């Protein structure tokens, strides 16, 4: 929906401004959507690992502002708003180490990196700050422990995801990746091999349950981590969006298209509610999605900041008489200590 004329700071109610929808129809700004209840998912948005990574990069950018160049290997988290905010602070995002000059400051993203990347960073004399999520680091340590004990490690995850790439590079021996039940049936493992599995942290217990069951069925002696090692944030957000989606007419999931966990929230919302949309910000909202809706649910991926949620609420308030409440759910009080800066 784009405005022929709009003034967000002035127009808070019925302003008589005509809006053009993406399909070409016109609507009048104001309370065109009538009375609408907005239900906010609990929990939503930043998890502790993302919060730690963002605060770490903020600290690094502030400390070295004007004195040394600060680089981040890949996006610090998968969110366009966050990345653009850091670019404005002068942080340079790169996709490979050869783009980082010797002697620069380099921050590893929340998704973690391989041992090879760490070693190459040392050889280049970089000042490295590791913002890897502690739960990802825990998976790395499990892979190393299993490998040292003679196990063939199987990783349940998505090919090409930054976290998976880093996890598979923790040991010199090959780590076998399985993405689905079909992979479990097709992988070739020596019958005498000791097997252990780990999982990508941004997959919930629900996401991995079928694959793990298939692994245990085919390899009855396979071992794996304690269920408490599953990322709490992924599970909590998925549980919340499934419950919220049953309460509302439309779901708006805030997150970037390259965010694995945000896309999963969208999938789960669609499974419960056909009217569900992934948006980077309020600017992506087409008001035609919301016509006839009396309850709108809002969730946000683990890498989406709360400011984006508030901006969506403010935008909806331009077009409806809003009542906003937060659903009952899990309250997360976990924080991770920031890495020390030299």
From Swiss-Prot:
(2E)-4-hydroxy-3-methylbut-2-enyl diphosphate binds at residues 78, 111, 161, 201, 259-261, 303. The lineage of its organism: Bacteria, Pseudomonadati, Pseudomonadota, Alphaproteobacteria, Rickettsiales. Isopentenyl diphosphate binds at residues 78, 111, 161, 259-261, 303. The gene is ispH. This is 4-hydroxy-3-methylbut-2-enyl diphosphate reductase. GO terms for biological process: dimethylallyl diphosphate biosynthetic process; isopentenyl diphosphate biosynthetic process, methylerythritol 4-phosphate pathway; terpenoid biosynthetic process. The active site is at 163 (proton donor). Pathway: Isoprenoid biosynthesis; dimethylallyl diphosphate biosynthesis; dimethylallyl diphosphate from (2E)-4-hydroxy-3-methylbutenyl diphosphate: step 1/1; Isoprenoid biosynthesis; isopentenyl diphosphate biosynthesis via DXP pathway; isopentenyl diphosphate from 1-deoxy-D-xylulose 5-phosphate: step 6/6. It comes from Anaplasma marginale (strain St. Maries). Its EC number is 1.17.7.4. The keyword 4Fe-4S applies. Pfam families: LYTB. It comes from the Bacteria.
């Amino acid at each position: 929906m784009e405005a022929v004329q709009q003034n967000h700071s002035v127009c808070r109610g019925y302003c008589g401004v005509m809006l053009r929808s993406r399909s070409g129809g016109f609507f009048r700004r104001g309370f065109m959507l009538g009375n609408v209840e907005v239900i906010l998912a609990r929990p939503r948005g930043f998890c502790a690992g993302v919060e730690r990574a963002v605060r770490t990069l903020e600290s690094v950018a502030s400390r070295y502002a004007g004195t040394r160049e600060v680089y981040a290997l890949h996006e610090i988290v998968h969110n366009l708003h966050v990345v653009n905010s850091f670019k404005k602070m002068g942080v340079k995002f790169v996709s490979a180490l050869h783009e980082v000059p010797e002697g620069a400051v380099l921050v590893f993203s929340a998704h973690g990196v391989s041992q090879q990347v760490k070693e190459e960073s040392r050889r280049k004399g970089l000042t490295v700050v590791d913002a890897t999520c502690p739960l990802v680091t825990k998976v790395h340590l499990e892979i190393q422990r299993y490998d040292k004990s003679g196990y063939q490690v199987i990783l349940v995850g998505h090919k090409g995801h930054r976290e998976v790439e880093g996890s598979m590079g923790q040991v010199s021996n090959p780590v076998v990746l399985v993405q689905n039940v079909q992979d479990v049936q097709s992988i070739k493992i020596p019958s005498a091999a000791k097997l252990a599995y780990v999982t990508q942290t941004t997959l919930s217990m629900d996401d991995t349950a079928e694959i793990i069951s298939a692994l245990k069925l085919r390899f009855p002696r396979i071992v794996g981590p304690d269920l408490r090692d599953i990322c709490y944030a992924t599970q909590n957000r998925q549980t919340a969006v499934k419950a919220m989606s049953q309460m509302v007419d439309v779901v708006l999931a805030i997150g970037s298209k390259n965010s694995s966990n945000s896309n999963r929230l969208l999938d789960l919302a669609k499974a419960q509610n056909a009217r569900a949309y992934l948006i980077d910000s309020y600017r992506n909202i087409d008001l035609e999605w919301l016509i006839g809706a009396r309850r709108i649910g809002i969730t946000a991926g683990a890498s989406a900041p709360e400011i984006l949620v508030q901006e969506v609420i403010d935008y909806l308030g331009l077009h409806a008489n809003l009542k906003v409440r937060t659903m009952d759910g899990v309250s997360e009080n976990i924080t991770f200590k920031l890495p020390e800066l030299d």
